[in-house]
Amino acid sequence: MSLGTEEKQNLINTHQVHPTDTGSVEVQVAMLTTRISKLSTHLQGNIHDFSSRQGLLKMIGQRKRLLGYVRSKSEKRYTELIEKLAIRG
């Protein structure tokens, strides 16, 4: 489940740290979160799609590592990102 160009640009504009930012950790986590949510809805209807499930687990692991990095650098940025994306209950 890939993201369209317009959707990517919208995510970049929403989560960028400075005006020319396109690849900060916040932007990467936002893109991964969107892809994860799309893929999880796909898997609810396609239970036996094991290759997509494996890709989903890889994306979740990547997002977890990126969030750990953000948390180690700044607890404030981490909590703001978590609240903005609503990924922790």
Curated annotation (Swiss-Prot):
One of its GO terms (biological process) is translation. Pfam families: Ribosomal_S15. Coiled coil: none annotated. The keyword Ion transport does not apply. InterPro entries: Ribosomal_uS15 (IPR000589), Ribosomal_uS15_bac-type (IPR005290), uS15_NS1_RNA-bd_sf (IPR009068). The keyword Zinc-finger does not apply. Keywords: Ribonucleoprotein, Ribosomal protein, RNA-binding, rRNA-binding. SMART domains: Ribosomal_S15. It comes from the Bacteria. One of the primary rRNA binding proteins, it binds directly to 16S rRNA where it helps nucleate assembly of the platform of the 30S subunit by binding and bridging several RNA helices of the 16S rRNA. Forms an intersubunit bridge (bridge B4) with the 23S rRNA of the 50S subunit in the ribosome. Part of the 30S ribosomal subunit. Forms a bridge to the 50S subunit in the 70S ribosome, contacting the 23S rRNA. Belongs to the universal ribosomal protein uS15 family. HAMAP family: Ribosomal_uS15_B (MF_01343_B). This is Small ribosomal subunit protein uS15. It comes from Prochlorococcus marinus (strain NATL1A).
